[in-house]
């Protein structure tokens, strides 16, 4: 039976447990070898329920998508441990199977049971995006993959450590299946260090407060999140609202793929029904069921940002994913481009939610992470792989214009500075600037997209791979706001500049020394009718170079021309 816990102790324990996860984040960010973790912070840590795997606490610095999806990863380990029948203190499981743990194969998950007085108390988990985990394409974003095996090597949940003893044969297998073993070993050591720190901090916490009190706090925090979510829903009108948006293509067949949602509120519950979404496709924009459910959680957290980050928030939310759709693709369907699909899921949820709560949602953000990988060999023969994400504009809201040049709504990750990338790889950023006329018009316009131009300084058989979206279907506005500009990718060859046939996806374009690639990323959609934007704001945007005079007059009329800036 759980102990009673007073509100002050509950608040203190909540803060202490969040701090544990935050410290685990911080130690990995400092220890990781690859900039995707060290600079972009594509990683996460948390505490998870001993029997259900539900998220209890997650660090604030990790990616939001991991809040929901890591509970599925822990559940996969719980199932595997039950199958083995001998879970012990000091065991650590490792795996990257996206159909069990969500997201994609680049995300390596470590799960460690935490025991207190010989009894399982909870799980600690670490996930980080490794630089390369094999597969056909360096960096693992393969737009032409038709199964998981073409994306990366697939590791099911296996024990990396048994009762505290690292199994070197498992490490040997993992390191043999990456192009960058030094980077992978550094990331693995960082994740192991984060788990060690988590165990140490949990020992300190339970030594101070006792296991019964901390357990009661964890239960109470989930119950509180449930109650807060229900209270928020009761403030909204009952009803049903629908939205549909599209992916450009699946990288194999150049046909649009619809993602549809019906959002229904009844009292203190919400249903998100994705009936009408495209069936499983040949290419890698499928996602596994855990990823789809976790994405719904991320969207809900954006709409209700003050709610706690634990599984209790999702108790009043019913997520209905059609069997056979690209949102519930079974193994071995390719899921490497999951980021593009979940961003479209968030867009349609926001668009539908605008009918129920227009003051709580934002217009569509730029809607693609633009995963660009450039790889080659240095003059000394050593291989190099530069992999990074490239930002764009966020949507306008009832309160303000959208954020200029931010990262994706699934992410709190940062975009690595060009100086870091130029120091690490033989490239030069010839341009990194805000993109004029990229934002959707509105009472509050969207944020600005960006322009990146990257030159290869050492040829060595360099190749570029792009996995993006929004090349054919622009980010939309809400509440009568307008759409933003499209995503545009181009690459340089001897006869000039070219665009890929699939618009937003490209595989293995050869680049000689001195040749460049260029990304013009979308802005965010506008919020509210452009006619409601004050002329002074339009004039300021023209003066700042955010919008051309011609576009300003087209979108907002001539009144801004009478304003002196």
Range-by-range predicted roles:
Residues 1-91, 97-116, 120-565:
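Glycine/proline-enriched, intrinsically flexible loops and inter-domain linkers
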